């Protein structure tokens, strides 16, 4: 249960979070990180250090061991698609067909229908163990983790668009864009992405992750970084 901090999170904007212990991660064991994304994250670490925080190159070791998590996530994703279609069918009052949803959704559900109870139980066990292992890093005294939001700069138009031949094309290509964020979809921890850099005129995000119930730190530190970077004043070379 998230703790009651006594006032709305919005009122944490502009407050002093105190000196925080922050870990910095600029690499991924699953994919190469674009130099613009890594450099922006490193520069953010320098900014945070300049604001008085204690910043170190360290991160949860759980993030180095996420191959099993990818398998478990896909199992959960497929079964979740089946449940979603069953819920939709209840609302429609009839069975859902492939004509009712996007081909990618239908394909995910088809995969989900083939998941055994043993595999589903195994996936839940893997995700549960991952959550517990991840939590120990924060329990060891760290307040925030700083990573790139994505391992690559923003994708070009249609780069992640599904095709008739491959309805899951976008999902397959999205891994570099989700490698830093998806672990925290699994743990349920609060995180924030801030546009703290740019690549070819497009924003590059940096992710800050807090422990359970510590959205207040994200609000306070996010405001500190906004005051330093002033991203609202930045414009791409071509903009409307």
Where are these regions (language model features)?
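Amidase signature
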Residues: 1-179, 186, 213, 224-240
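Structural detector of well-ordered beta-strand residues that form the stable sheet scaffold
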Residues: 145-147, 192, 209
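Short secondary-structure boundary segments
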Residues: 148-150, 194-197
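Short beta-strand->loop structural element characteristic of the AMP-binding/adenylate-forming
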Residues: 170, 191-193
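Short, well-ordered beta-strand elements
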Residues: 194, 202-211, 218-219
């Amino acid at each position: 249960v998230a703790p009651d901090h006594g006032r709305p999170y919005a009122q944490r904007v502009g407050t002093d979070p105190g000196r925080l212990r922050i870990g910095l991660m600029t690499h991924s064991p699953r994919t190469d990180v674009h130099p613009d994304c890594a450099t922006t994250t490193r520069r953010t670490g320098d900014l945070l250090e300049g604001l008085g925080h204690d910043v170190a190159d360290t991160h949860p070791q759980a993030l180095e061991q996420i191959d099993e998590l990818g398998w478990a996530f896909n199992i959960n994703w497929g079964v979740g698609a089946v449940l979603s279609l069953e819920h939709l069918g209840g609302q429609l009052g009839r069975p859902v067909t492939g004509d009712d949803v996007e081909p990618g959704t239908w394909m995910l559900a088809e995969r989900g229908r083939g998941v055994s109870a043993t595999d589903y139980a195994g996936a839940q066990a893997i995700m549960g163990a991952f959550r517990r292992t991840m939590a120990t890093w924060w329990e060891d005294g760290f307040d925030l983790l700083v990573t790139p939001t994505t391992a690559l700069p923003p994708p070009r138009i249609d780069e992640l668009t599904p095709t008739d031949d491959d309805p899951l094309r976008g999902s397959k290509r999205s891994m570099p864009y989700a490698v830093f964020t998806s672990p925290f979809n699994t743990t349920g921890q609060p995180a924030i992405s801030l546009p703290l850099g740019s690549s070819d005129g497009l924003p590059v995000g940096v992710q800050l992750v807090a422990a359970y119930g510590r959205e207040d730190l994200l609000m306070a530190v996010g405001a500190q970084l906004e005051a330093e970077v002033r991203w609202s004043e930045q414009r791409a070379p071509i903009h409307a």
